[in-house]
Amino acid sequence: MEDTTQWLSDASTAIHISLVSPSESGLQHVATFNPRHTYSIFGDDEKIFGYQDLKVNLRYRANDMRPHLNISYSKKSGTINELEPTDVAAILDEGNHLPKIAFAKARDFEESSKQLSDDWTPPGKLHTTFDSPEGQYEIWCGNLADPAVKQLNSRLQIFVPLFIEGGTYIGQDPDEDSAELDLSDADRWTFFSLYQKRKVGDKTAYVFVGYSTIYRFYYFQPPTPPASPQSDEWELPNGNMDLGELPCRTRLSQFIILPPFQGKGNGARLYKTIFEHYHKIPQTYEFTVEDPNEAFDDLRDICDLQFLRKMPEFNNLLVDTNIKIPKKGFLPKLIIGSSLLEEIRLRAKIAPRQFGRVLEMHLMSKLPVSVRPTMAIEDQPAATKADQHEAKVWGLIVKQRLYRHNKEVLSQIEPAERVEKLDDTLHGVGLEYARILAAVDRSDKYEGQTTASSKRKLDADEITEDLSNKKARVEDA
C-alpha cells in the first residue's frame, strides 16, 4: 500500500482567510488569518488529501464581506489506495458553506469592488457608535428576514464551524445529513454586526470586525388564575396580534470576533451593547447564551459581573458572618439580603445558573485577603478565626450550587467521598473565580481610562441623513 503522507495537507494551515479593502488603486490587504477548526467540513482528522503545497485562499471584501475562493497547489495526485483527491471547491459549495458568488472568477470579484459606491453602508440600521484607541466603530442591527442581512449571514456563516467549537448554521438540523437550511423562522433572528471605520486614501471605509446572532423564544410565565369576568359576554381575542409584544427569552446563539480584532475589547463592547439593548426591552424576561465555550464564558462572566455591580441591591449582598453553621440538619440562609436574590436576578434578566456563578464571584471578591482564593504566589496574611468562618460560609454557598447541579452523580457515591469531591471542586472553582476577577479588575482599569464620550447612542436629531431608508446592495448571492 502506497504511503499517502506526502499528499496530506492540514486543513487549518492550508486555508488562508484574508480581508481586502476596495480602494482607487485596487484591493488593499487588511489582514490574513487561519481557522481554528475544520473537522466539521473536512472530517475529524482535519486533513485534505491529494495535493502538495496546497493553498485554499478565501478572500473577503472587508466591507460587504463578499467572498472569493481560489485554490492553488504545486502537484495533484491521482487515485492512491482507492482515494481520490479531495474536491475542496465541491465540498464548500455542496455543503452550503459558501454562497455561489464565492466561486466566481477573480476578475469579477475585483471588478465588482470598483463598482461599490462611496456611500455604502452595512445592512440594517445603525445602532451604536463608539471610539477606541484603534479608531471609530459602529454596530449595526438587522433582522434575518431582510434580504441584505440574510445575504450577509450567508457569506459569514462559514466562520461558525471554523471558529466555534461544535458550531452549526442557522436553520441547520444537526441530526440530518442534508445541507439544506430552513430559514422559515428568519423573522425571529436578529443580526448584530460590528465594523471599524478606517481611512483608505482620502475616503472612509468599513472593515468588518465580528457579529452575533440572537433568537427569540416565547417565555412561559407561571400560570396565574384568570380574572373574574365582568359580564356574561365573551369574545375571541383579535387575530392581529403583534408577536413582538409577547414575553420572550432572548438567546445569544452565535458570537464571533475575527482573530485580527481580538484582544482589543471588541468582544466585550459587542456583548455589552447586545445585553443592554435587550435588557431595556420590556418583553425580554431573560437573556441566555447557547452552549458557550470557555473563552466566551470568561467574556460573559466579566461583562455580567460589571453590569450587576452597577445595581446597589446586588452590591449590598454579603456573606452572613453572624450565622452559626449546624453540624446536622438544614443550613440557615447564608447571604445577607438573600430574600432579594430572585428579585435582583429577574431585574437583571440573567439566567439562574449564570446569576448564581457571578454572585459567588462577587461574594468571593469581598472575602478577607487572608482567605480569598488567589492565583498570586505571594504569601497571604495570617487568617483570623473570623476570616476562616467567613470563608467557610462562602464555601458552603458554592457547594450548595455545585450539589444541586450534580445531585444525580453525587448521590451515587459514599458521603465521605462526596465531601472530598466537593472540596476538590470548590478549590478549582475558587482559582477560576480568582482568574476572572483579576480580568474584571483589568477591564475596570481600562474602561476608567476611556472618556465618557467614547460611546454614545444615536439620537434622532444627531442623524442628518435617514440611514434606515438606505438600501444595502444585494448581489446575486
Swiss-Prot record:
The record marks W189 as: Interaction with histone H4 N-terminus. Residues 444-477 are annotated as: Disordered. Keywords: Acyltransferase, Chromatin regulator, Cytoplasm, DNA damage, DNA repair, Nucleus, Transferase. It catalyses: L-lysyl-[protein] + acetyl-CoA = N(6)-acetyl-L-lysyl-[protein] + CoA + H(+). It comes from the Eukaryota. GO terms for biological process: DNA repair; subtelomeric heterochromatin formation. GO terms for molecular function: histone acetyltransferase activity; histone binding. GO terms for cellular component: chromosome, telomeric region; cytoplasm; nucleus. Its EC number is 2.3.1.48. It is an enzyme of class 2 (transferase). Residues 467-477 have a biased composition (Basic and acidic residues). Acetyl-CoA binds at F255, I256, I257, Q262, G263, K264, G265, N266, G267, A268. The active site is at E290 (proton donor/acceptor). Residues 44-46, 215-217 are annotated as: Interaction with histone H4 N-terminus. It is found in: Cytoplasm; Nucleus. Component of the HAT-B complex composed of at least HAT1 and HAT2. The HAT-B complex binds to histone H4 tail. This is Histone acetyltransferase type B catalytic subunit. The gene is HAT1.
